[in-house]
């Protein structure tokens, strides 16, 4: 089983779209889309990881 991951190399970004493609973080928080999630990953210095796609 491959680990679930998202490429956040292009982040952080100053603004995210309102696109609704939820991701569940390792903090058990649902992020609205990849942009919101990746900005949080950068802020966490890489401690936040993707738990799974979809709502937590």
Curated annotation (Swiss-Prot):
Disulfide bonds join 8-38, 16-35, 24-56. SUPFAM superfamilies: Kazal-type serine protease inhibitors. The keyword Disulfide bond applies. It is found in: Secreted. GO terms for molecular function: serine-type endopeptidase inhibitor activity. Keywords: Disulfide bond, Glycoprotein, Protease inhibitor, Repeat, Secreted, Serine protease inhibitor. Glycans are attached at residue 45. One of its GO terms (cellular component) is extracellular space. Pfam families: Kazal_1 (PF00050). This is Ovomucoid. It comes from Pavo cristatus (Indian peafowl).
